[in-house]
Protein backbone atom coordinates (compact mmCIF):
# COMPACT_ATOMS: atom_id res chain seq x y z
CA UNK A 1 0.00 0.00 0.00
CA UNK A 2 1.32 3.47 -0.92
CA UNK A 3 -0.04 6.99 -0.51
CA UNK A 4 -1.25 8.43 -3.81
CA UNK A 5 0.08 11.89 -4.57
CA UNK A 6 -2.76 12.95 -6.91
CA UNK A 7 -1.12 14.51 -9.96
CA UNK A 8 -3.10 17.32 -11.64
CA UNK A 9 -2.78 17.66 -15.42
CA UNK A 10 -4.49 20.44 -17.35
CA UNK A 11 -5.21 21.46 -20.93
CA UNK A 12 -6.13 24.96 -22.09
CA UNK A 13 -7.63 26.00 -25.43
CA UNK A 14 -8.03 29.77 -25.20
CA UNK A 15 -8.04 33.03 -27.12
CA UNK A 16 -4.30 33.45 -26.52
CA UNK A 17 -3.32 30.58 -28.83
CA UNK A 18 -6.48 29.19 -30.46
CA UNK A 19 -9.11 30.37 -32.92
CA UNK A 20 -12.81 30.69 -32.06
CA UNK A 21 -13.45 27.56 -34.15
CA UNK A 22 -10.94 25.54 -32.12
CA UNK A 23 -12.39 26.82 -28.83
CA UNK A 24 -15.88 25.85 -29.95
CA UNK A 25 -14.65 22.38 -30.93
CA UNK A 26 -13.05 21.94 -27.50
CA UNK A 27 -16.20 23.18 -25.75
CA UNK A 28 -18.61 20.87 -27.54
CA UNK A 29 -21.31 19.91 -25.03
CA UNK A 30 -21.97 21.07 -21.48
CA UNK A 31 -19.41 21.34 -18.70
CA UNK A 32 -21.04 18.50 -16.78
CA UNK A 33 -21.07 16.22 -19.82
CA UNK A 34 -17.37 16.96 -20.34
CA UNK A 35 -16.58 16.13 -16.71
CA UNK A 36 -18.46 12.84 -16.97
CA UNK A 37 -16.55 11.96 -20.15
CA UNK A 38 -13.21 12.62 -18.47
CA UNK A 39 -14.17 10.60 -15.38
CA UNK A 40 -14.93 7.64 -17.64
CA UNK A 41 -11.33 7.56 -18.89
CA UNK A 42 -8.95 5.03 -17.36
CA UNK A 43 -6.94 6.27 -14.39
CA UNK A 44 -8.85 9.55 -13.91
CA UNK A 45 -10.17 10.05 -10.36
CA UNK A 46 -11.23 13.71 -10.54
CA UNK A 47 -12.14 16.16 -13.31
CA UNK A 48 -12.99 19.85 -13.70
CA UNK A 49 -13.98 21.68 -16.91
CA UNK A 50 -14.31 25.43 -17.55
CA UNK A 51 -15.97 26.66 -20.75
CA UNK A 52 -16.55 30.28 -21.78
CA UNK A 53 -16.75 31.97 -25.16
CA UNK A 54 -12.99 32.61 -25.00
CA UNK A 55 -11.66 29.43 -23.42
CA UNK A 56 -12.20 25.71 -22.94
CA UNK A 57 -10.09 24.18 -20.18
CA UNK A 58 -10.00 20.76 -18.56
CA UNK A 59 -8.16 19.48 -15.49
CA UNK A 60 -7.90 15.88 -14.33
CA UNK A 61 -6.34 14.09 -11.37
CA UNK A 62 -4.47 10.82 -11.94
CA UNK A 63 -1.70 8.85 -10.24
CA UNK A 64 0.84 10.00 -12.84
CA UNK A 65 1.13 12.72 -15.47
CA UNK A 66 1.20 10.25 -18.38
CA UNK A 67 -2.25 8.90 -17.49
CA UNK A 68 -3.68 12.39 -17.11
CA UNK A 69 -2.14 13.59 -20.37
CA UNK A 70 -3.52 10.59 -22.27
CA UNK A 71 -7.02 11.23 -20.90
CA UNK A 72 -6.95 14.88 -21.94
CA UNK A 73 -5.52 14.05 -25.37
CA UNK A 74 -8.42 11.68 -25.98
CA UNK A 75 -10.93 14.24 -24.77
CA UNK A 76 -9.50 16.94 -27.11
CA UNK A 77 -8.90 14.61 -30.05
CA UNK A 78 -10.77 16.90 -32.46
CA UNK A 79 -8.71 19.99 -31.61
CA UNK A 80 -5.48 20.90 -33.44
CA UNK A 81 -2.39 20.18 -31.35
CA UNK A 82 -1.03 23.71 -31.75
CA UNK A 83 -4.26 25.10 -30.25
CA UNK A 84 -3.82 23.10 -27.02
CA UNK A 85 -1.59 24.20 -24.17
CA UNK A 86 -0.82 21.23 -21.93
CA UNK A 87 -0.15 22.02 -18.27
CA UNK A 88 1.90 20.08 -15.73
CA UNK A 89 0.85 19.71 -12.08
CA UNK A 90 2.36 23.00 -10.88
CA UNK A 91 1.45 24.82 -14.09
CA UNK A 92 -2.17 23.66 -13.79
CA UNK A 93 -2.53 24.93 -10.24
CA UNK A 94 -0.96 28.32 -11.00
CA UNK A 95 -2.82 28.70 -14.29
CA UNK A 96 -6.18 28.08 -12.64
CA UNK A 97 -5.39 30.80 -10.09
CA UNK A 98 -4.36 33.19 -12.88
CA UNK A 99 -7.59 32.46 -14.75
CA UNK A 100 -9.70 33.19 -11.66
CA UNK A 101 -7.79 36.44 -11.12
CA UNK A 102 -8.50 37.53 -14.69
CA UNK A 103 -4.83 37.55 -15.73
CA UNK A 104 -5.62 35.18 -18.62
CA UNK A 105 -8.73 37.07 -19.80
CA UNK A 106 -9.07 39.22 -22.90
CA UNK A 107 -9.55 42.11 -20.51
CA UNK A 108 -7.13 41.79 -17.59
CA UNK A 109 -8.96 41.58 -14.29
CA UNK A 110 -12.49 41.24 -15.67
CA UNK A 111 -14.96 40.12 -13.02
CA UNK A 112 -17.16 37.68 -14.93
CA UNK A 113 -14.56 34.90 -15.05
CA UNK A 114 -14.64 34.49 -11.25
CA UNK A 115 -18.34 33.64 -11.37
CA UNK A 116 -17.74 31.32 -14.32
CA UNK A 117 -15.08 29.39 -12.36
CA UNK A 118 -17.49 29.13 -9.43
CA UNK A 119 -20.28 27.83 -11.70
CA UNK A 120 -17.90 25.30 -13.27
CA UNK A 121 -16.93 24.12 -9.78
CA UNK A 122 -20.59 23.52 -8.89
CA UNK A 123 -21.15 21.73 -12.21
CA UNK A 124 -18.20 19.40 -11.59
CA UNK A 125 -19.29 18.74 -8.01
CA UNK A 126 -22.77 17.90 -9.25
CA UNK A 127 -21.50 14.92 -11.25
CA UNK A 128 -18.85 13.74 -8.78
CA UNK A 129 -15.85 15.28 -10.52
CA UNK A 130 -14.44 17.18 -7.55
CA UNK A 131 -12.43 15.16 -5.05
CA UNK A 132 -9.96 16.33 -2.38
CA UNK A 133 -7.24 17.42 -4.81
CA UNK A 134 -9.34 19.55 -7.17
CA UNK A 135 -11.52 20.79 -4.32
CA UNK A 136 -8.48 22.41 -2.71
CA UNK A 137 -7.20 23.68 -6.08
CA UNK A 138 -10.44 25.34 -7.22
CA UNK A 139 -11.28 26.80 -3.82
CA UNK A 140 -7.77 28.25 -3.64
CA UNK A 141 -8.21 29.75 -7.13
CA UNK A 142 -11.52 31.34 -6.08
CA UNK A 143 -9.91 32.65 -2.90
CA UNK A 144 -6.99 34.30 -4.68
CA UNK A 145 -9.36 35.64 -7.35
CA UNK A 146 -11.38 37.40 -4.66
CA UNK A 147 -8.21 38.69 -2.98
CA UNK A 148 -6.96 40.11 -6.27
CA UNK A 149 -10.12 42.15 -6.75
CA UNK A 150 -10.39 43.42 -3.17
CA UNK A 151 -6.70 44.13 -2.53
CA UNK A 152 -5.62 45.54 -5.92
CA UNK A 153 -6.97 47.70 -8.76
CA UNK A 154 -6.92 44.77 -11.20
CA UNK A 155 -10.60 45.23 -12.12
CA UNK A 156 -10.85 49.02 -12.10
CA UNK A 157 -11.47 51.12 -15.21
CA UNK A 158 -12.34 50.20 -18.80
CA UNK A 159 -9.38 48.71 -20.67
CA UNK A 160 -10.89 46.98 -23.71
CA UNK A 161 -12.30 48.80 -26.69
CA UNK A 162 -15.59 46.99 -26.13
CA UNK A 163 -16.02 48.05 -22.51
CA UNK A 164 -14.51 51.49 -23.17
CA UNK A 165 -16.99 52.07 -26.00
CA UNK A 166 -19.90 51.28 -23.69
CA UNK A 167 -18.53 53.54 -20.96
CA UNK A 168 -18.03 56.29 -23.54
CA UNK A 169 -21.65 55.95 -24.66
CA UNK A 170 -22.89 55.86 -21.06
CA UNK A 171 -21.12 59.12 -20.22
CA UNK A 172 -22.34 61.00 -23.31
CA UNK A 173 -25.71 59.48 -24.13
CA UNK A 174 -26.71 57.08 -21.34
CA UNK A 175 -27.25 53.35 -21.80
CA UNK A 176 -29.27 52.43 -18.70
CA UNK A 177 -32.54 50.81 -19.70
CA UNK A 178 -31.65 51.06 -23.38
CA UNK A 179 -32.02 48.61 -26.25
CA UNK A 180 -28.56 47.85 -27.61
CA UNK A 181 -27.53 46.30 -30.92
CA UNK A 182 -24.16 44.52 -31.05
CA UNK A 183 -22.97 43.68 -34.55
CA UNK A 184 -20.43 40.83 -34.51
CA UNK A 185 -19.66 37.99 -32.09
CA UNK A 186 -15.89 38.08 -31.92
CA UNK A 187 -13.57 39.35 -29.21
CA UNK A 188 -14.50 43.06 -29.15
CA UNK A 189 -18.19 42.47 -29.81
CA UNK A 190 -18.29 39.96 -26.96
CA UNK A 191 -16.69 42.41 -24.54
CA UNK A 192 -19.09 45.16 -25.62
CA UNK A 193 -22.11 42.87 -25.17
CA UNK A 194 -20.95 41.88 -21.69
CA UNK A 195 -20.40 45.53 -20.77
CA UNK A 196 -23.98 46.24 -21.88
CA UNK A 197 -25.38 43.21 -20.05
CA UNK A 198 -26.10 45.01 -16.80
CA UNK A 199 -27.25 48.53 -17.83
CA UNK A 200 -29.19 47.68 -21.00
CA UNK A 201 -32.69 46.24 -20.75
CA UNK A 202 -32.31 44.36 -24.03
CA UNK A 203 -29.39 43.30 -26.24
CA UNK A 204 -29.71 42.26 -29.89
CA UNK A 205 -26.76 40.33 -31.36
CA UNK A 206 -26.33 40.38 -35.15
CA UNK A 207 -23.77 38.14 -36.81
CA UNK A 208 -23.16 36.30 -40.07
CA UNK A 209 -22.76 33.00 -38.21
CA UNK A 210 -25.93 32.59 -36.19
CA UNK A 211 -24.49 29.87 -33.92
CA UNK A 212 -21.81 32.23 -32.60
CA UNK A 213 -24.37 34.95 -31.99
CA UNK A 214 -26.55 32.49 -30.09
CA UNK A 215 -23.60 31.36 -27.97
CA UNK A 216 -22.88 34.99 -27.03
CA UNK A 217 -26.54 35.72 -26.31
CA UNK A 218 -26.70 32.72 -23.96
CA UNK A 219 -23.93 34.21 -21.83
CA UNK A 220 -25.91 37.39 -21.17
CA UNK A 221 -28.24 37.71 -18.19
CA UNK A 222 -30.39 40.47 -19.70
CA UNK A 223 -33.01 39.84 -22.39
CA UNK A 224 -31.11 38.91 -25.55
CA UNK A 225 -32.09 38.00 -29.10
CA UNK A 226 -30.23 37.07 -32.28
CA UNK A 227 -30.63 38.29 -35.88
CA UNK A 228 -28.68 37.89 -39.09
CA UNK A 229 -26.51 40.67 -40.50
CA UNK A 230 -29.07 41.16 -43.26
CA UNK A 231 -31.52 42.35 -40.59
CA UNK A 232 -29.26 45.07 -39.18
CA UNK A 233 -31.49 47.87 -40.51
CA UNK A 234 -34.53 46.59 -38.59
CA UNK A 235 -32.50 45.95 -35.44
CA UNK A 236 -30.90 49.42 -35.63
CA UNK A 237 -34.33 50.98 -35.86
CA UNK A 238 -35.20 49.39 -32.49
CA UNK A 239 -31.87 50.26 -30.85
CA UNK A 240 -30.75 53.26 -28.81
CA UNK A 241 -27.10 52.18 -28.89
CA UNK A 242 -25.27 50.36 -31.70
CA UNK A 243 -21.82 48.79 -31.26
CA UNK A 244 -20.25 47.31 -34.39
CA UNK A 245 -17.11 45.17 -34.25
CA UNK A 246 -16.93 42.70 -37.13
CA UNK A 247 -13.92 41.64 -39.16
CA UNK A 248 -15.59 42.44 -42.46
CA UNK A 249 -13.64 44.07 -45.29
CA UNK A 250 -16.81 45.84 -46.42
CA UNK A 251 -19.16 48.20 -44.66
CA UNK A 252 -21.71 46.32 -42.57
CA UNK A 253 -23.87 49.36 -41.74
CA UNK A 254 -24.59 51.89 -44.48
CA UNK A 255 -26.42 55.19 -44.37
CA UNK A 256 -29.67 53.56 -45.50
CA UNK A 257 -29.62 51.25 -42.47
CA UNK A 258 -29.57 54.28 -40.15
CA UNK A 259 -31.96 56.53 -42.00
CA UNK A 260 -34.90 57.40 -39.81
CA UNK A 261 -33.67 55.58 -36.70
CA UNK A 262 -33.93 58.71 -34.57
CA UNK A 263 -31.66 59.43 -31.61
CA UNK A 264 -28.99 56.72 -31.82
CA UNK A 265 -25.42 56.43 -30.55
CA UNK A 266 -23.28 54.38 -32.96
CA UNK A 267 -19.88 53.08 -31.81
CA UNK A 268 -17.71 51.76 -34.63
CA UNK A 269 -14.79 49.85 -33.06
CA UNK A 270 -14.00 47.70 -36.10
CA UNK A 271 -10.80 47.88 -38.14
CA UNK A 272 -11.44 48.46 -41.02
CA UNK A 273 -14.53 50.48 -40.20
CA UNK A 274 -17.97 48.86 -40.25
CA UNK A 275 -20.02 52.06 -40.62
CA UNK A 276 -20.14 53.81 -43.97
CA UNK A 277 -18.93 57.44 -44.17
CA UNK A 278 -21.77 59.90 -44.08
CA UNK A 279 -23.71 58.12 -41.35
CA UNK A 280 -22.54 60.73 -38.87
CA UNK A 281 -24.44 63.34 -40.87
CA UNK A 282 -27.84 61.71 -40.40
CA UNK A 283 -30.13 63.64 -38.07
CA UNK A 284 -30.08 62.24 -34.54
CA UNK A 285 -27.24 59.79 -35.26
CA UNK A 286 -23.89 60.25 -33.48
CA UNK A 287 -21.06 58.04 -34.76
CA UNK A 288 -17.83 57.53 -32.81
CA UNK A 289 -14.82 55.65 -34.19
CA UNK A 290 -11.69 53.97 -32.83
CA UNK A 291 -9.61 57.15 -32.57
CA UNK A 292 -12.18 58.73 -30.27
CA UNK A 293 -12.63 55.70 -28.03
CA UNK A 294 -9.05 54.39 -27.72
CA UNK A 295 -7.90 57.38 -25.67
CA UNK A 296 -10.29 56.34 -22.87
CA UNK A 297 -8.50 53.02 -22.29
CA UNK A 298 -4.85 54.09 -21.92
CA UNK A 299 -4.86 55.20 -18.27
CA UNK A 300 -6.93 52.21 -17.10
CA UNK A 301 -4.61 49.78 -18.93
CA UNK A 302 -1.58 51.20 -17.14
CA UNK A 303 -3.25 50.81 -13.74
CA UNK A 304 -4.25 47.21 -14.41
CA UNK A 305 -0.78 46.27 -15.66
CA UNK A 306 0.68 47.58 -12.41
CA UNK A 307 -1.93 45.67 -10.39
CA UNK A 308 -1.24 42.50 -12.40
CA UNK A 309 2.35 42.42 -11.11
CA UNK A 310 1.05 42.49 -7.54
CA UNK A 311 -1.45 39.74 -8.33
CA UNK A 312 1.29 37.52 -9.81
CA UNK A 313 3.20 37.79 -6.53
CA UNK A 314 -0.02 36.98 -4.69
CA UNK A 315 -0.46 33.85 -6.84
CA UNK A 316 3.08 32.69 -6.05
CA UNK A 317 2.38 33.03 -2.32
CA UNK A 318 -0.98 31.25 -2.49
CA UNK A 319 0.56 28.49 -4.62
CA UNK A 320 3.11 27.79 -1.88
CA UNK A 321 0.30 27.70 0.69
CA UNK A 322 -1.59 25.21 -1.49
CA UNK A 323 1.46 22.97 -1.90
CA UNK A 324 2.03 22.97 1.86
CA UNK A 325 -1.64 22.10 2.34
CA UNK A 326 -1.35 19.16 -0.06
CA UNK A 327 1.82 17.88 1.58
CA UNK A 328 0.37 18.10 5.07
CA UNK A 329 -2.78 16.23 4.03
CA UNK A 330 -0.79 13.43 2.41
CA UNK A 331 1.45 13.07 5.44
CA UNK A 332 -1.64 13.05 7.64
CA UNK A 333 -2.98 10.06 5.69
CA UNK A 334 0.05 8.05 6.76
CA UNK A 335 0.06 9.44 10.28
CA UNK A 336 -3.60 8.49 10.65
CA UNK A 337 -2.81 4.96 9.42
CA UNK A 338 0.08 4.76 11.88
CA UNK A 339 -2.08 5.80 14.83
CA UNK A 340 -4.89 3.54 13.67
CA UNK A 341 -2.54 0.55 13.70
CA UNK A 342 -1.16 1.55 17.10
CA UNK A 343 -4.66 1.91 18.50
CA UNK A 344 -5.53 -1.61 17.36
CA UNK A 345 -2.42 -3.03 19.02
CA UNK A 346 -3.10 -1.01 22.18
CA UNK A 347 -6.69 -2.26 22.37
CA UNK A 348 -5.57 -5.86 21.85
CA UNK A 349 -2.86 -5.70 24.50
CA UNK A 350 -5.20 -4.00 26.96
CA UNK A 351 -7.67 -6.82 26.53
CA UNK A 352 -4.89 -9.34 27.14
CA UNK A 353 -3.66 -7.53 30.26
CA UNK A 354 -7.15 -7.12 31.70
CA UNK A 355 -7.88 -10.80 31.05
CA UNK A 356 -4.76 -11.81 32.99
CA UNK A 357 -5.74 -9.61 35.94
CA UNK A 358 -9.23 -11.08 35.91
CA UNK A 359 -7.76 -14.59 35.88
CA UNK A 360 -5.44 -13.85 38.82
CA UNK A 361 -7.76 -11.67 40.90
CA UNK A 362 -11.27 -12.63 41.81
CA UNK A 363 -12.51 -9.08 41.58
CA UNK A 364 -10.35 -8.25 38.55
CA UNK A 365 -9.40 -4.60 37.99
CA UNK A 366 -11.35 -1.81 39.58
CA UNK A 367 -12.72 0.94 37.36
CA UNK A 368 -9.98 3.28 38.60
CA UNK A 369 -7.25 0.71 37.95
CA UNK A 370 -8.62 0.12 34.46
CA UNK A 371 -8.47 3.87 33.79
CA UNK A 372 -4.86 4.02 34.97
CA UNK A 373 -3.79 1.11 32.77
CA UNK A 374 -5.57 2.56 29.74
CA UNK A 375 -4.13 6.02 30.40
CA UNK A 376 -0.64 4.52 30.55
CA UNK A 377 -1.22 2.73 27.23
CA UNK A 378 -2.44 5.97 25.63
CA UNK A 379 0.62 7.82 26.92
CA UNK A 380 2.95 5.16 25.53
CA UNK A 381 1.33 5.33 22.10
CA UNK A 382 1.50 9.12 22.06
CA UNK A 383 5.13 9.30 23.16
CA UNK A 384 6.33 6.49 20.90
CA UNK A 385 4.65 8.01 17.83
CA UNK A 386 5.47 11.66 18.52
CA UNK A 387 8.90 11.60 16.87
CA UNK A 388 7.79 9.50 13.84
CA UNK A 389 4.85 11.89 13.36
CA UNK A 390 7.15 14.90 13.14
CA UNK A 391 9.55 12.98 10.89
CA UNK A 392 6.72 12.15 8.50
CA UNK A 393 5.62 15.78 8.36
CA UNK A 394 9.20 16.83 7.67
CA UNK A 395 9.44 14.18 4.94
CA UNK A 396 6.26 15.53 3.34
CA UNK A 397 7.66 19.07 3.33
CA UNK A 398 10.75 17.73 1.54
CA UNK A 399 8.71 15.60 -0.92
CA UNK A 400 10.38 12.49 0.52
CA UNK A 401 7.62 10.08 -0.49
CA UNK A 402 9.92 7.06 -0.26
CA UNK A 403 10.13 7.55 3.50
CA UNK A 404 6.39 8.18 3.78
CA UNK A 405 5.48 5.07 1.81
CA UNK A 406 7.99 3.01 3.79
CA UNK A 407 6.27 4.18 6.97
CA UNK A 408 2.91 3.22 5.52
CA UNK A 409 4.22 -0.27 4.80
CA UNK A 410 5.38 -0.55 8.41
CA UNK A 411 2.38 0.97 10.13
CA UNK A 412 -0.44 0.78 7.61
CA UNK A 413 -3.71 -1.14 8.07
CA UNK A 414 -3.54 -4.85 7.37
CA UNK A 415 0.19 -5.07 8.01
CA UNK A 416 0.34 -5.45 11.79
CA UNK A 417 1.67 -8.86 12.92
CA UNK A 418 -0.61 -11.49 14.36
CA UNK A 419 -0.37 -11.91 18.15
CA UNK A 420 1.62 -15.12 17.67
CA UNK A 421 4.24 -13.40 15.52
CA UNK A 422 6.44 -12.09 18.32
CA UNK A 423 9.30 -9.77 17.41
CA UNK A 424 12.89 -10.83 18.01
CA UNK A 425 14.38 -9.10 21.04
CA UNK A 426 17.99 -7.92 20.55
CA UNK A 427 20.57 -9.85 22.58
CA UNK A 428 22.20 -6.60 23.70
CA UNK A 429 22.52 -2.88 22.94
CA UNK A 430 24.55 -3.65 19.81
CA UNK A 431 21.52 -5.50 18.40
CA UNK A 432 19.43 -2.34 18.43
CA UNK A 433 19.48 -0.41 15.10
CA UNK A 434 21.89 2.52 15.34
CA UNK A 435 19.28 5.17 14.49
CA UNK A 436 16.98 3.89 17.23
CA UNK A 437 19.87 3.40 19.68
CA UNK A 438 20.75 7.11 19.39
CA UNK A 439 17.26 8.04 20.58
CA UNK A 440 17.26 5.68 23.60
CA UNK A 441 18.46 6.58 27.08
CA UNK A 442 21.36 4.65 28.64
CA UNK A 443 18.92 3.17 31.16
CA UNK A 444 16.77 1.72 28.39
CA UNK A 445 19.81 0.27 26.62
CA UNK A 446 20.99 -1.39 29.83
CA UNK A 447 17.75 -3.35 29.94
CA UNK A 448 18.87 -5.33 26.89
CA UNK A 449 21.96 -6.50 28.77
CA UNK A 450 19.80 -8.03 31.51
CA UNK A 451 17.24 -9.77 29.28
CA UNK A 452 18.82 -13.22 29.85
CA UNK A 453 19.21 -12.83 33.60
From Swiss-Prot:
Record pathway: Porphyrin-containing compound metabolism; protoporphyrin-IX biosynthesis; 5-aminolevulinate from L-glutamyl-tRNA(Glu): step 1/2
Amino acids binding substrate: 52-55, 105, 110-112, 116
Stored SUPFAM superfamilies: Glutamyl tRNA-reductase catalytic, N-terminal domain, Glutamyl tRNA-reductase dimerization domain, NAD(P)-binding Rossmann-fold domains
Site feature Important for activity, where: 95
Domain of life where this protein originates: Archaea
Enzyme Commission (EC) number: 1.2.1.70
Region (Disordered): 413-453
Compositionally biased spans, kind Low complexity: 413-424
Keywords, alphabetical: NADP, Oxidoreductase, Porphyrin biosynthesis
Binding site residues for NADP(+): 184-189
CDD domains from the UniProt entry: NAD_bind_Glutamyl_tRNA_reduct
Enzymatic reactions: (S)-4-amino-5-oxopentanoate + tRNA(Glu) + NADP(+) = L-glutamyl-tRNA(Glu) + NADPH + H(+)
Active site: 53 (nucleophile)
Gene3D superfamilies named in the record: Glutamyl-tRNA reductase, N-terminal domain, NAD(P)-binding Rossmann-like Domain
GO molecular function per UniProt: glutamyl-tRNA reductase activity; NADP binding
GO BP annotations, alphabetical order: protoporphyrinogen IX biosynthetic process from glutamate
Entry domain remark: Possesses an unusual extended V-shaped dimeric structure with each monomer consisting of three distinct domains arranged along a curved 'spinal' alpha-helix. The N-terminal catalytic domain specifically recognizes the glutamate moiety of the substrate. The second domain is the NADPH-binding domain, and the third C-terminal domain is responsible for dimerization.
Subunit composition and interactions: Homodimer.
Function: Catalyzes the NADPH-dependent reduction of glutamyl-tRNA(Glu) to glutamate 1-semialdehyde (GSA).
Similarity field: Belongs to the glutamyl-tRNA reductase family.
Miscellaneous note of the record: During catalysis, the active site Cys acts as a nucleophile attacking the alpha-carbonyl group of tRNA-bound glutamate with the formation of a thioester intermediate between enzyme and glutamate, and the concomitant release of tRNA(Glu). The thioester intermediate is finally reduced by direct hydride transfer from NADPH, to form the product GSA.
Protein name: Glutamyl-tRNA reductase
Organism, as annotated: Natronomonas pharaonis (strain ATCC 35678 / DSM 2160 / CIP 103997 / JCM 8858 / NBRC 14720 / NCIMB 2260 / Gabara) (Halobacterium pharaonis)
Gene name of this polypeptide: hemA
